[in-house]
Amino acid sequence: MKRLLRTGLSFCLVLSILAGLMTLTSSCSSHSKSTTTEDSTHLSIGVMPSIDYLPIAVAEQQGFFSRPIDIVRFASPMERDAALQTGSVDASVTDYMGAMLLHSKGLKVSLPIACQGGFRMVFGQGKELSSIADLRNKHIGLSSNTLIDYATERALVDASGKPFPYTRVEVQKIPIRLEMLSSGELDAAILPEPFATIGASKGLKTIEVPNQLTVGITGLLFQDAALANKAEAVKSFVEGYNKAIAYMAQHPRQEWSGALEKLLGVPAELALKIPLPTYTEVTLPKAADLQPILEWMKNKGLVPATYTAEGLVRPIVAE
């Protein structure tokens, strides 16, 4: 059932979200293939508005990259993945499902870095909902064939583990998903941080996503051509990323929360409140984290039954 989009947000929330969207749009439109994949001195990284890429933002803010890094922001998974497919970016922070979808289609990519993020189930404004069990037959916002789709389906089960019915509402862009929750047009949706905290600050109820379904599910996906042809830029990125991890661990958040505000569009009053994961230095994704997602994808017919993701997770080889 189609629902008409109505804005139910406060003026401040509209400004904070739309400001981030304008940054996303301007960043995307200012980059082209000729200035990214064909320039061996630059590395372009596609990102979504989530805390998965906070170490990259901090490294950028603190000047830890010795080679130029272009952070290219996207508002939806579809836009992000299209940019990697067309060579408009050298790499992107993506969920493991997106990585396997592209790899299964023959795109020459590697997943050498695991990222850390955060997600919460957020309930719509004015809804008498407080638990997963309350979501039976409710309208749930998601984007199809993404990690959110997977986590939603796996989360919405009864006490015996049997899936219960709900109405899927396709909403690709995360800020719009939050907007529809705030206006009461959606009953619930899984949102990444910082959007879950932004919603909570406006009175929306949130709970943890059950069974750690959204833990260990994102990484940095590189074009193989970029790894081969931009070795120095990739080395600079890895070194800068690791420096940022150490810096964040050794310094109070007040010293680097500006990255949350400037590059993630988080309102200043929330930058110190957002729950953050424990970020780790560059490390490979775990096969055990990919496997349940891959099985779900096979059951949905998203990848061939014979696809194993072999060769996708590979370390960056130092030159």
Regions picked out by a protein language model, each given a short descriptive name:
Residues M1-H42, E319:
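Short, low-complexity disordered leader/linker segments with a strong preference
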Residues S50, M78, V93, L142-L147, ...:
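Soluble non-cytosolic domains of exported or imported proteins
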Residues A57, M100, E153, T197, ...:
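Predominant activation on well-ordered alpha-helical scaffold segments within soluble catalytic domains
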Residues M97, K127, P165-V169, K173-L260:
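Pocket-lining segment of extracytoplasmic ligand-binding domains
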Residues A228-P304:
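Secondary-structure end/capping motifs
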Residues K298-E319:
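Conserved C-terminal helix/tail region of periplasmic/extracytoplasmic solute-binding proteins
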